[in-house]
């Protein structure tokens, strides 16, 4: 651009040095009108993700929308809360306005300044290029037993990020290969129906759910629901090994590993599958089959609400006002993966409960990355790891903006929580597969 500006500057100087003829002045004015906007054009749209952002959650939706339009997005790790930046287009600016998010239109010089700041070796920042919108699937039942207050379903709808709901039928048919990212609904992969049988008010729901699940199992050639769920869990694990991205919350995390470990035994009471649990089940657990957890004790008591001692949420005595966990600060330039997954405008996140609230740190496998923990209680709330060519993330608790979850509760209205730090962690995982693979150094 400079090679065009220098001759023009020389021309302007001589045009005015002698007062300038009217024709020459008119020509200069016309040139300024036509070409000056090119020299001062808007280069980028910056979506800040610090405390200035009006709606953090919908900001992820805009970034996803830009990707679906075939455009790239730069994720600026640790810059103003993990901001997004993309090349300026009027339609992108319009979309930001429509969705009500905070954005800034910046020129070339400011874009270069930001990238120079991020590239400084002395600062804990980096940028990751997001290239293609991942195809999203949520593993959840399609009948009335779907958890309408599932946090992932709620936030995907609020952020206007498209997704498909798939369940056992689709997975057993091999449909997982169609997707880049899978969320596990708050499922019980052990075949014990989340141990709801004897909970007050759940008897009829338990009986109906059991009937539906057993019919599905028989249709696919399984004698027991637990055997069908085990096969589904193994297929999901294979999906991850092949390069898929797996995200699970609450009981979808611990029951997944429990089912895999118990693949060669029976941990289900007769009330759940028609025969008694194997008395030697504990000794037959195979922890080499799991993703995250090892050396845990299963709870085969049908009257207990616990699956195992992985979850420490049942025994903790912490008031809601004191229940917080802290995100780790990773090196953005070297620990790129956990840095992406922990981008947030708050580093201390308020806790929330669920069937699986918090993970016992002593039960984690070596190599598991703890991204969020309550150190004083020896519990991990947010963990990550690799399996084969894929990656997985487990997040304890049910609803980041609903401390106590009960069946039948009204789903959280995220328009009342547009800046939720806890929900941001979910959306970090949704965008994660869009990142250029060669940048993932961890």
Segment roles from a protein language model:
Residues 42-148, 397, 404:
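Hydrophobic targeting/anchoring helices
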Residues 119-124, 169-171, 377-381:
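Alpha-helical scaffolding within the catalytic cores
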Residues 147-150, 155-157, 254, 265, ...:
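Catalytic beta-strand/loop cores that center a nucleophilic Ser/Cys/Thr
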Residues 261, 270-272, 281-282:
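Catalytic cores of eukaryotic secretory-pathway lumenal/extracellular enzymes that build
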């Amino acid at each position: 651009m400079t090679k065009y500006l220098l001759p023009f500057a020389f021309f302007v100087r001589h045009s005015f040095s002698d007062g300038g003829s009217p024709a020459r002045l008119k020509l200069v004015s016309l040139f300024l009108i036509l070409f000056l906007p090119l020299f001062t054009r808007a280069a980028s749209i910056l979506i800040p993700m610090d405390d200035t952002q009006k709606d953090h959650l919908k900001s992820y939706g805009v970034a996803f929308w830009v990707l679906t339009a075939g455009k790239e997005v730069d994720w600026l790790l640790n810059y103003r809360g993990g901001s997004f930046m993309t090349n300026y287009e009027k339609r992108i600016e319009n979309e930001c306005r429509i969705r009500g998010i905070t954005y800034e239109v910046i020129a070339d010089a400011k874009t270069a300044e930001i990238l120079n700041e991020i590239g400084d070796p002395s600062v804990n920042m980096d940028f990751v290029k997001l290239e293609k919108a991942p195809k999203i699937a949520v593993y959840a039942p399609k009948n009335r037993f779907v958890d309408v207050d599932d946090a992932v379903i709620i936030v995907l709808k609020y952020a206007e990020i498209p997704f498909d709901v798939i369940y056992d039928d689709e997975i057993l048919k091999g449909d997982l290969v169609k997707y880049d990212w899978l969320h596990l609904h708050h499922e019980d992969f052990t075949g014990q129906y989340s141990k709801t049988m004897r909970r007050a008010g759940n008897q009829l729901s338990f009986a109906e759910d059991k009937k539906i699940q057993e019919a599905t199992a028989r249709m696919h050639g399984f004698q027991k629901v637990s055997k069908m769920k085990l096969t589904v869990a193994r297929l999901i694990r294979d999906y991850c090994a092949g390069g898929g991205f797996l995200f699970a919350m609450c009981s979808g995390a611990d029951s997944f590993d429990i089912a895999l470990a118990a693949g060669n035994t029976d941990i289900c009471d007769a009330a759940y599958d028609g025969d008694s649990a194997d008395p030697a089940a504990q000794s037959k657990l195979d922890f080499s089959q799991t993703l995250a957890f090892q050396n845990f004790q299963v709870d085969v008591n049908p009257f207990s609400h616990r699956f195992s001692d992985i979850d420490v949420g049942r025994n903790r005595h912490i008031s809601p006002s004191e229940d917080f966990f802290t995100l780790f600060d990773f090196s953005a330039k070297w620990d790129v993966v956990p840095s992406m997954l922990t981008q947030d405008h708050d580093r201390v996140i308020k806790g929330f409960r669920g069937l699986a609230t918090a993970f016992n740190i002593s039960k984690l496998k070596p190599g598991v990355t703890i991204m969020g923990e309550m150190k004083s209680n020896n519990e991990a709330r947010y963990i990550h790891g690799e399996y084969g060519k894929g990656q997985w993330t487990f997040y304890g608790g049910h609803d980041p903006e609903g401390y106590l979850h009960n069946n039948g509760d009204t789903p959280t209205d995220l328009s009342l929580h547009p800046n939720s730090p806890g929900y941001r962690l979910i959306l970090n995982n949704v965008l994660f597969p869009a990142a250029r693979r060669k940048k993932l150094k961890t």
